[in-house]
Amino acid sequence: MSIKTEEISSLIKKQLANYQDQISVEETGTVTYVGDGVARADGLENAMAGELLEFENGVYGMAQNLESNDVGIVILGDDTAIREGDTVKRTGRIMEVPVGDALLGRVVDPLGRSIDGLGDIKTDKTRPIERKAPGVMERKSVSQPLQTGIKVIDALVPIGRGQRELIIGDRKTGKTSIAIDTIINQKDQDMICIYVAIGQKESTVRSQVETLRKFGALDYTIVVSASASNPAPLLYIAPYAGAAMGEEFMFGGRDVLIIYDDLSKQADAYRELSLILRRPPGREAYPGDIFYTHSRLLERAARLSDDLGGGSMTALPVIQTQAGDVSAYIPTNVISITDGQIFLDADSFYAGQRPAIDAGTSVSRVGGDAQIKAMKKVSGTLRLDIASYNELAAFAQFGSDLDAATKARLDRGERTMEVLKQGLHAPQPVEQQVVTLYALAHNYLDDVPVDDVLRFESELATFMRSNHQDLYDSIKQSGQLPDGDGLDKALDAFKAGFQTSDQKQDASVAQN
């Protein structure tokens, strides 16, 4: 049997035509140390800062320290299966998380993996967790209100869409409650909410998720949880992961509210990582770039220009203080980065004034431009009234001999403080707040006993919804107080039929 030369030649040519030259080049290194959520590896000379690295058991890490002889890596997962001598390879990518509508209503970890037992998250869109914040010309001034549903905030410390407003106070003073109530109040407001829980107990996060579900708020909320049992690197990246998820909606022209609860624990996690990586410690043992850690995160909150879709991301970072000390390192850093702060006072909280917001030290630097005109009118003198009352109340403790004018101001102050009280998970629509504060400002509460003030407010809201819904609608749609004397007439009619507790008791005795 003879084989023709032409056949051999054509076979070789066919094989050469079908040959695909696929060379896979991987830059790998060797783990030289592992422990406390951190690894060191040599042989990764070209690794980039923030690059995602993969260990041979499938766990990922992020390059943090680029040194002359090795790379410091923070491990984004369980480090118990990683051993000295293991291989680690470059991926050429920076850390990314899944984003999009598929995450709404879900509870995820900082890597975007489902932890709520409802199966995998089906989305093919991802975003890098680190992104340069929008520049000056890419932004628009804050001019639209974000209603929290909490009277004292919407009246005295208004928040605008795209603002960064710090919630600061000691532990157990109601910081998280304000954040959760604000999320609940965004129902039917076309607002996407992201709640980032950093370093909290898993039972606490579960309770907050159930609260959101109970009020129908989980449908438009993403919960990112890095619990206290997670490694420090996950606590550190959690806020950045939440911001990346929010940016997907913001650049799509949507409005986003993101809550970081709380950044004190993120700072502690970053301090832990930095000390293990042997970075030089600074004040309170925090690394030198702790300010940048928070500023680059909070600067990502913005209201975008119309050219970029006009979306917004409003940030409410939470900071925990020790014994009310706002002059500590992390609190002063975040106060200087944000556009204002809501300060919660422990003494007021334990005295029953809840929410325990200190009107004197709480401020909103840009939210006033976003406040509706009706609220501006009815809350104009509120801050001064509270300051005057607190001063007089402190003075009145030393003696009971007060003149009539001083006593009248004290009585009015007591009613003002009572009006500003609000129950847990009971946010109010802005039109209801306006009518309540209008009644306070126009002396409708002056002869109502302090114990009856909250009942007066509740019954007034029911009366207005039943008989004068048009006035509520007018305030909601126009943002202005109703024209004419319609509101005064409605309040007069309600006041005429309102019975104080004493009057009810007298009527009951008379019937018997």
Curated annotation (Swiss-Prot):
GO terms for cellular component: plasma membrane; proton-transporting ATP synthase complex. Keywords: ATP synthesis, ATP-binding, Cell membrane, CF(1), Hydrogen ion transport, Ion transport, Membrane, Nucleotide-binding, Translocase, Transport. It is found in: Cell membrane. PROSITE patterns: ATPASE_ALPHA_BETA. The keyword Transmembrane helix does not apply. Its EC number is 7.1.2.2. ATP binds at residues 169-176. NCBIfam families: atpA, PRK13343.1. F-type ATPases have 2 components, CF(1) - the catalytic core - and CF(0) - the membrane proton channel. CF(1) has five subunits: alpha(3), beta(3), gamma(1), delta(1), epsilon(1). CF(0) has three main subunits: a(1), b(2) and c(9-12). The alpha and beta chains form an alternating ring which encloses part of the gamma chain. CF(1) is attached to CF(0) by a central stalk formed by the gamma and epsilon chains, while a peripheral stalk is formed by the delta and b chains. PANTHER family: ATP SYNTHASE SUBUNIT ALPHA, MITOCHONDRIAL. This is ATP synthase subunit alpha.
